């Protein structure tokens, strides 16, 4: 079985996230995609973070494909960092082929993640195109550090079975939706407190 692991704050989840998930399922030939809603992101301000239960509920609404399984694995495992979550998932599922799925907009800061090199050395990574990231991804530290491990996207269907480090950049339809922009719109609509 091949499973994509797609983690994020999803604050809020939106059609752009669903598009990334659908592209990953189709292009990577995944049996399932685990949409992993994190309790929080150590690199982001948590003051605007909706509750985990709310983000899970909204993710369930956005993720319509039955192959997408919305989870709160980090909360269940009581871990904070992706590297720890992925190690626990792999240990609990030794017969599953996993691939880490991320939107290209996250690639610029991937080198700031706790033990990011460990993630890249232990999991194949699929980077899905996002607006404004198509060309800039090449200058990211991850792309430069692991340039010899990049696969042409035509090999995306076999990525999950490749020995890491291995990664690919997948082009395709892009959504301009952004959680940050959606939160700003919500703040403008919210009644002011006087």
Curated annotation (Swiss-Prot):
Enzyme Commission (EC) number: 2.7.7.18
Keyword field: ATP-binding, NAD, Nucleotide-binding, Nucleotidyltransferase, Pyridine nucleotide biosynthesis, Transferase
Transmembrane segments: none
Any GO MF annotation of the entry: ATP binding
Top-level EC class as recorded in UniProt: transferase
A Pfam family hit: CTP_transf_like
Alphabetical list of InterPro entries matching this protein: Cyt_trans-like, NadD/NMNAT, Rossmann-like_a/b/a_fold
Pathway in which this enzyme or protein is active: Cofactor biosynthesis; NAD(+) biosynthesis; deamido-NAD(+) from nicotinate D-ribonucleotide: step 1/1
GO biological processes: NAD biosynthetic process
Catalytic activity entry: nicotinate beta-D-ribonucleotide + ATP + H(+) = deamido-NAD(+) + diphosphate
General function of this protein: Catalyzes the reversible adenylation of nicotinate mononucleotide (NaMN) to nicotinic acid adenine dinucleotide (NaAD).
NCBIfam families: nicotinate (nicotinamide) nucleotide adenylyltransferase, PRK00071.2-2, PRK00071.2-4
Similarity field: Belongs to the NadD family.
Protein name: Probable nicotinate-nucleotide adenylyltransferase
Natural source organism: Brucella suis biovar 1 (strain 1330)
């Amino acid at each position: 079985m091949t499973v994509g692991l797609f983690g994020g704050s999803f604050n809020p989840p939106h059609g752009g996230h669903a598009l990334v998930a659908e592209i990953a399922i189709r292009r990577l030939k995944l049996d399932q995609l685990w949409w992993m809603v994190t309790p929080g992101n150590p690199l982001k301000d948590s003051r605007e973070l909706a509750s985990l239960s709310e983000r899970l509920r909204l993710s369930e609404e956005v993720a319509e494909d039955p192959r997408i399984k919305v989870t709160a694995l980090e909360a269940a495992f009581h871990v904070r960092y992706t590297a720890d979550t992925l190690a626990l998932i792999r240990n609990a599922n030794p017969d599953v082929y996993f691939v880490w799925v991320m939107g290209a907009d996250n690639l610029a800061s991937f080198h700031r993640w706790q033990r990011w090199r460990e993630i890249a050395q232990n999991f194949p990574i699929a980077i899905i195109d996002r607006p404004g990231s198509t060309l800039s991804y090449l200058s990211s530290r991850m792309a430069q550090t692991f340039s010899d491990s990049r696969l042409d996207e035509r090999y995306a269907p076999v990525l999950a079975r490749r020995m890491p480090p291995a990664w690919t950049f997948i082009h395709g339809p892009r959504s301009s939706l952004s959680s940050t922009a959606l939160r700003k719109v919500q703040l403008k609509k919210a009644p002011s407190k006087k």
